[in-house]
Amino acid sequence: MTTQVVNVIGAGLAGSEAAYQIAKRGVQVRLYEMRPVRQTPAHHTDKFAELVCSNSLRANTLTNAVGVIKEEMRLMDSVIIRAADECSVPAGGALAVDRHEFAAKVTEYVKNHPNVTVVNEEITEIPEGPTVIATGPLTSPDLSAQLKELTGEDYFYFYDAAAPIVEKDSIDMNKVYLKSRYDKGEAAYLNCPMTEEEFDRFYEALIAAETVPLKEFEKEIFFEGCMPVEVMASRGRQTLVFGPMKPVGLEDPKTGKTPYAVVQLRQDDAAGTLYNIVGFQTHLKWGPQKEVLQLIPGLENAEIVRYGVMHRNTFINSPNLLRPTYQYKQRDDLFFAGQMTGVEGYVESAASGLLAGINAARLVKGEEPVVLPPVTAMGSMANYITATNAKNFQPMNANFGLFAPLEKKIKKKAERNEAYATRALETIRNFVNI
C-alpha cells in the first residue's frame, strides 16, 4: 500500500464517490467536509451526499443516457448507486430514494472505510499533494477566491445561464434554413423563421408560462448581465424582435423576404448532433418550457436534451483547464469532480467523482490515469466537458447526443438508443478492474 494520502475536498455526491474509489484501491484518503462547522445556504444536515433538491436520480432504464451511466457505475462498484439502489422508493421507471436513508447510507459506507479519515473543517486554500476538489455549486467564498486565482478570472463562473439544447434529428429541416447574419463567414446557424402571427402566439405563451421560484441565494443572478428570455419578453413584445429574435440580415432563401422574427440554433457539439437555442437562457419550468419551445417553427417535435436553466452554480471552464481524466492541465496531481467541472445532475456528478477518484488512486500508485472512451456514458461526459467549445461552455446532463456516433445510422430512436446502451456497457466491462 502506498503511504501517500489523497485529499478530497467536499463530501457531496462527487467527493463521497471519489473518496470511496480511492480508498478501495488501497490508498489513504483525507476527506474534508466543512459541514456542520460551516453550513451552506442549501444544506440542512452534516451527512455526506445530501440531496438538496429532488430525491430522484432520474431514469433507471437503458433507453435513457442517465440510465446507462447508472448501469456503468453499478459495474464499476459506485458507492452512490449502491446506496441509491438500497434506499430506493417507488418511482416508476426512475430511481428515487429516501433522501435521509440515502445520505446516512453513503456516510456509513465512506466514513467506515478503514482508509478514510474525515476532517470536519473548511478548506480555504488548495492543498499541496494529490487532491480532488469536489466542493460543488455552493463552494465557500474563500475557496472560490482561491480557485478563481488558480484558474484565472475568465475561466471561473458563479452561475449557469444555459439555453435549451435540442437533437438535430428532431428538427424539421423543411421549415428552417442555414444562414449566418448578412452571410458573414460560413453559414453557421439554423434559422427558424416566424410570421407576425406565429410570433404573437409564441410571445403570449412565453409571458404566461410558469417560472421556477428563485431561492434566496440565487436572487443576484440576473444582475450579472444575463437576462432570461421571459424577463426580456415581459418588457414588451418588441424587446425580443430587437434582441435575440431579430431578423435583420436573415432573409429566408425560400421567399427572399425577411421574416418577422427569427429564432437561431447554433451547433453545440463537434459531431453536429446537438443545437442550442441562441439567447434563450430561461427560468421557465420544464413542462411549460417544452410547450413554448415547440411553438417555434421547425421545433414542433423537438427532442430537448437539456432544458434552459439559470441558477447559482460554481463551475470552471473545463475545456480550457481539464483533461478527460479530470486532471488539471497545469498540475497533474490536482483533480476536479462534480458540478464544478460542468457536469449537470446528481448522477453525472457522482460519475465524475468515480473517474477522478480512480485516476487519483492510479496516479499515487504510479499507474497511468484512464480515459474512458466516448462510446461510454461516463466517457462521453468527460469528453464533452474537456473537448467542447470553450467559448460557449455551459454545464450539461448525460444524453445520447454526446456519445460517439454509431458506425451504422439507425433511424428509429428506440433502436438507436438501445444500440448506444449495448455498445456502452460492452465497452465499460473492459474497465471494471482498473
From Swiss-Prot:
Its cofactor is FAD. It comes from Bacillus cereus (strain AH187). It holds the Pfam family GIDA. This is Methylenetetrahydrofolate--tRNA-(uracil-5-)-methyltransferase TrmFO. FAD binds at residues 10-15. It is an enzyme of class 2 (transferase). It catalyses: uridine(54) in tRNA + (6R)-5,10-methylene-5,6,7,8-tetrahydrofolate + NADH + H(+) = 5-methyluridine(54) in tRNA + (6S)-5,6,7,8-tetrahydrofolate + NAD(+); uridine(54) in tRNA + (6R)-5,10-methylene-5,6,7,8-tetrahydrofolate + NADPH + H(+) = 5-methyluridine(54) in tRNA + (6S)-5,6,7,8-tetrahydrofolate + NADP(+). Catalyzes the folate-dependent formation of 5-methyl-uridine at position 54 (M-5-U54) in all tRNAs. InterPro entries: FAD/NAD-bd_sf, MnmG-rel, MnmG-rel_CS, MnmG_N, TrmFO. The keyword Lipid metabolism does not apply. It is found in: Cytoplasm. Transmembrane segments: none annotated. Signal peptide: none annotated.
